[in-house]
């Protein structure tokens, strides 16, 4: 009870061959459901199928399993039958030749004939080298005689936007306005320094212009405020020019000390200025329109405020411009 008869060696060989073929043919079966909606095997599945069939054919040719082992994959007949070749008798061959000859004779001749075209004559002049890119060979070809070498595509000119033009004009006017008021403020600072210089060298009660009693028909005025026509007008602007040169000399000296870094003063001054400019540049907006609006607002405050506030606003404007150059 419960015992099965022993299998023969041939049966075991057939079962082993079937297991081998099932493993090889497993990759040929696509995974998932195949429907008529358009799901096709992937390229990987096709390549696996080709490789598997090559392995199966190789094993089949080598006789790796006995006859009958490949019945599950349709390999019941390992040796394929040869396709029979048609055999022609001499009579049938003669009939075929006669039929082809009659067809050639009865076929109507062609009505349209294409005249033979002569090859293009290339003109090679002495000294021309086609490998060097000369145009002599191409110019003789009819294809290059009617068409330009480089196609030219004409595009209509782009129309300028009114908003961009108006923005550029507005930015230019604001820049001119700021430059004008900065120049006026620099002249005012130079006049105050000139007035301080005159007050050091002259008594407080004698601040009148010394050139107004030389016969010129001008109203009384203080030194440093000479109008046009007074002999002291040129001397006033000469002093302003000297003061401006002294300020530039001091600034150049500070820059020289800063670049060399030979003194502690230069290092401290450079560190303080760098920290100031970095802090100001971090507070500045990155949008150019916001920077223009900030400068314009400072200019309006400068025009409508007192002298002390004007000085602070001017220093703020100079620091802002310096921070912009430092940031860029």
Swiss-Prot record:
Lipidation (N-myristoyl glycine): 2
Positions annotated as glycosylated: 260
Keyword line: Fusion of virus membrane with host membrane, Glycoprotein, Host-virus interaction, Lipoprotein, Membrane, Myristate, Phosphoprotein, Transmembrane, Transmembrane helix, Viral attachment to host cell, Viral envelope protein, Viral penetration into host cytoplasm, Virion, Virus entry into host cell
Side of membrane Virion surface, spans: 2-163, 258-282
Record topology, Intravirion segments: 2-236, 185-236, 304-328
PTM summary: Myristoylation contributes importantly to DHBV infectivity. It is most likely required for an early step of the life cycle involving the entry or uncoating of virus particles. Phosphorylated on pre-S domain for about 50% of L proteins, the L chains with internal pre-S region (Li-HBsAg).
Region (Pre-S): 2-161
Biased composition (Basic and acidic residues): 92-109
Compartments, as annotated in UniProt: Virion membrane
Cited InterPro entries: HBV_HBSAG (IPR000349)
Region (Disordered): 77-123
Residue stretches spanning the membrane: 164-184, 237-257, 283-303
Annotated GO biological process: membrane fusion involved in viral entry into host cell; symbiont entry into host cell; virion attachment to host cell
Family: Belongs to the avihepadnavirus major surface antigen family.
Its biological purpose: The large envelope protein exists in two topological conformations, one which is termed 'external' or Le-HBsAg and the other 'internal' or Li-HBsAg. In its external conformation the protein attaches the virus to cell receptors and thereby initiating infection. This interaction determines the species specificity and liver tropism. The large envelope protein probably also assumes fusion between virion and host membranes. In its internal conformation the protein plays a role in virion morphogenesis and mediates the contact with the nucleocapsid like a matrix protein. Truncated S protein may be involved in translocation of pre-S domain through the virion membrane.
Assembly and oligomerization: Large internal envelope protein interacts with capsid protein.
Descriptive protein name: Large envelope protein
Organism: Duck hepatitis B virus (strain Germany/DHBV-3)
Higher taxonomy: Viruses, Riboviria, Pararnavirae, Artverviricota, Revtraviricetes
């Amino acid at each position: 009870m419960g015992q099965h008869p022993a299998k023969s060696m041939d049966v075991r060989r057939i079962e082993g061959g079937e297991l081998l073929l099932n493993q090889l043919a497993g990759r040929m079966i696509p995974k998932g459901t195949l429907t008529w909606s358009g799901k096709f095997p992937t390229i990987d599945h096709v390549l696996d199928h080709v490789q598997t069939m090559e392995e199966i054919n190789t094993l089949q040719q080598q006789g790796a399993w006995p006859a009958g082992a490949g019945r599950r994959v349709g390999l019941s007949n390992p040796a394929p039958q040869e396709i029979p070749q048609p055999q022609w008798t001499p009579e049938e061959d003669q009939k075929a030749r006669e039929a082809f000859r009659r067809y050639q004779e009865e076929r109507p001749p062609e009505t349209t004939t294409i005249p033979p075209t002569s090859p293009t004559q290339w003109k090679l002049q002495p000294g021309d080298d086609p490998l060097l890119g000369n145009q002599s060979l191409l110019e003789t070809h009819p294809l290059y005689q009617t068409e330009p070498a480089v196609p030219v595509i004409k595009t209509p000119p782009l129309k300028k936007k009114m908003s961009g033009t108006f923005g550029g004009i507005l930015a230019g006017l604001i820049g001119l306005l700021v430059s004008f008021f900065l120049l006026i403020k620099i002249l005012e600072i130079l006049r105050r320094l000139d007035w301080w210089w005159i007050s050091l060298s002259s008594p407080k009660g004698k601040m009148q212009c010394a050139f107004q009693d030389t016969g010129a028909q001008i109203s009384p005025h203080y030194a440093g405020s000479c109008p046009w026509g007074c002999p002291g007008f040129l001397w006033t602007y000469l002093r302003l020019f000297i003061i401006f040169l002294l300020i530039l000399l001091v600034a150049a000296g500070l820059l020289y000390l800063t670049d060399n870094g030979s003194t502690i003063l230069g290092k401290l001054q450079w560190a303080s200025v760098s920290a100031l400019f970095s802090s100001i540049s971090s507070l500045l907006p990155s949008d150019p329109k916001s920077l223009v609006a900030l400068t314009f607002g400072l200019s309006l405050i400068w025009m409508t405020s007192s002298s002390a506030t004007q000085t602070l606003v001017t220093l703020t404007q100079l620091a802002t411009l310096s921070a912009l150059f430092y940031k860029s």
